[in-house]
């Protein structure tokens, strides 16, 4: 049996401000730092250890990973950074307040943009200063690989090649993985692992900073999954994610 640990980054400054973040590179709040440390403490208390860590190229995920590994005394672990683990790109919504956007367009439309499988938000213009196409961290990518907007379907299509080419082979060789990523890149992985339908994925919310453990068989099919720590607290935190965007 293999174990895979997925952690959504701790609270970011734009989580706190209830803003659409996407690929915007915002930092953790003090609460987010504590959530990341608590994730490490939970993992340490349960006896978890790792051989390699994976994260995105966005600082809220990389800092979450660092604080988690620091609590585990594993800051020396090899870390694989990939843009494919970035948060879903929210297009022209990036930087906007979720509640104000809901008041303008309606709760239903914002829910579709936030949680539906195949409907992306309005795209950024290519020359919009919020676009990441001139960001040095994406310099080796083609312009088409740096999105101007994404739906979850697009995020799945971006994440799965990385799972198939890097993460899954590492697990099959017996390496123990911890992944610090984002709500939607984790939703993409969970959708694939659990075979969740396009319709059902709308209701899945990933809480900040709580380790999600997958136990996998030799074919990397899930045997079970669970959050570490207080299950009721994890459920409450997921519900809080679901309520974002409401006035």
Swiss-Prot record:
PROSITE patterns, A to Z? PG_MUTASE (PS00175)
Q: So what EC number does this one have?
A: 5.4.2.11
Residues reported in the UniProt entry to bind substrate: 8-15, 21-22, 60, 87-90, 98, 114-115, 183-184
Keywords of this protein's UniProt record, alphabetized?
Gluconeogenesis, Glycolysis, Isomerase
Q: Where is this site: Transition state stabilizer?
A: 182
Its UniProt pathway annotation is: Carbohydrate degradation; glycolysis; pyruvate from D-glyceraldehyde 3-phosphate: step 3/5
Tell me any Pfam family this protein matches.
His_Phos_1
Which reaction equations make up its catalytic activity?
A: (2R)-2-phosphoglycerate = (2R)-3-phosphoglycerate
For this chain's UniProt record, which GO biological process terms are given?
A: gluconeogenesis; glycolytic process
Record has Isomerase as a keyword: yes
InterPro entries on file: His_Pase_superF_clade-1 (IPR013078), His_PPase_superfam (IPR029033), PG/BPGM_mutase_AS (IPR001345), Phosphogly_mut1 (IPR005952)
Q: Which GO terms describe its molecular function?
A: phosphoglycerate mutase activity
Locate the active site.
Answer: 9, 87
CDD domains per UniProt? HP_PGM_like
Which residue spans adopt a coiled-coil conformation according to this UniProt entry? Answer: none
What does the record give as the function of this protein? Catalyzes the interconversion of 2-phosphoglycerate and 3-phosphoglycerate.
Subunit and partners: Homodimer.
Q: Which family does it belong to?
A: Belongs to the phosphoglycerate mutase family. BPG-dependent PGAM subfamily.
Q: Kindly provide the name given to this protein in its UniProt entry.
A: 2,3-bisphosphoglycerate-dependent phosphoglycerate mutase
Question: From which organism does this entry originate?
Answer: Variovorax paradoxus (strain S110)
């Amino acid at each position: 049996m293999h174990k895979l640990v997925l952690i959504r980054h701790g609270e970011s400054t734009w989580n706190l401000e209830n803003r659409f973040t996407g690929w915007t590179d915002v930092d953790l709040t003090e609460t987010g730092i504590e959530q990341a440390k608590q994730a490490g403490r939970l993992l340490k208390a349960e006896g978890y250890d790792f051989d390699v860590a994976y994260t995105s190229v966005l600082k809220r995920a990389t800092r979450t990973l660092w604080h988690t590994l620091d609590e585990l005394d594993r800051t020396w672990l090899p870390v694989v950074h990939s843009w494919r683990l970035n948060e879903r790109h929210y297009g022209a919504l990036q930087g906007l307040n979720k509640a104000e956007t809901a008041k303008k367009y309606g709760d239903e439309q914002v829910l579709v943009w936030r949680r539906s499988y195949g409907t992306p938000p309005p795209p950024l213009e290519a020359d919009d200063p919020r676009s990441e196409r001139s960001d040095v961290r994406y310099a080796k990518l083609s312009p088409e690989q740096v999105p101007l907007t994404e739906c979850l379907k697009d995020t799945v299509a971006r994440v799965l090649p990385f799972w198939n080419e890097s993460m899954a082979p590492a697990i099959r060789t017996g390496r123990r993985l911890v992944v610090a990523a984002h709500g939607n890149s984790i939703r993409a992985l969970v959708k694939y692992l659990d075979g969740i339908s396009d319709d059902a994925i709308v209701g899945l919310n990933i809480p900040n900073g709580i380790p999600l453990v997958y136990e996998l068989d030799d074919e990397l099919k899930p045997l079970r999954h669970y959050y570490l720590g207080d299950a009721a607290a994890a459920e409450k935190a997921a519900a809080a994610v679901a309520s974002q965007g409401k006035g």
